[in-house]
Regions:
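Cross-family detector of peptidyl-prolyl cis-trans isomerase
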Residues: 1-132
């Protein structure tokens, strides 16, 4: 395992503290934060639900590491996703669009995952289209 980049880890912790102070940000029981962009009125998913979403995932520097293609939503089983998504999406009605911020321990943790460095805070813009 590569050595820990303590400066990077600290920048991510500082980002979380700053984000928590933004207007409209709600903090969930485990530290996931979200900001409602569009309020939906549909069904909320359960852990075994299949969800269809549009999303963009980026790091605190704004670098996009993953996203759906325009017009092609992704479908997932909720309980197979990272904890940050599971926590937020369980409370998100279909039709909603939220910005979700997941601390590293609820994302990919202390190990790198492809282009995502260890200790990365993950920022997602998620539109929940459908719950089945």
């Amino acid at each position: 395992m590569p050595p820990v980049d303590n400066a990077y880890k600290l920048r991510n912790q500082e980002f979380l503290q700053e984000y928590a102070q933004k207007p409209g940000v709600k903090i969930m029981f485990n530290g996931v934060m979200y900001r409602e962009i569009t309020k939906g009125h549909g069904q909320k998913p359960s852990p075994k639900s299949f969800i269809s979403v549009y999303y963009t995932g980026k790091l605190i520097n704004g670098k996009v590491f993953d996203q759906t293609q325009k017009g092609k939503p992704a479908t997932f089983r909720l309980n197979e996703l990272i904890t940050g998504w599971i926590t937020a999406l369980r409370e998100m009605p279909a039709g909603s669009r939220w910005e979700i911020v997941s601390p590293y321990n609820l994302g990919y943790g202390s190990r790198p995952a492809g282009a995502i460095k260890a200790f990365s805070t993950l920022i997602f813009d998620i539109t929940l289209l459908d719950v089945r």
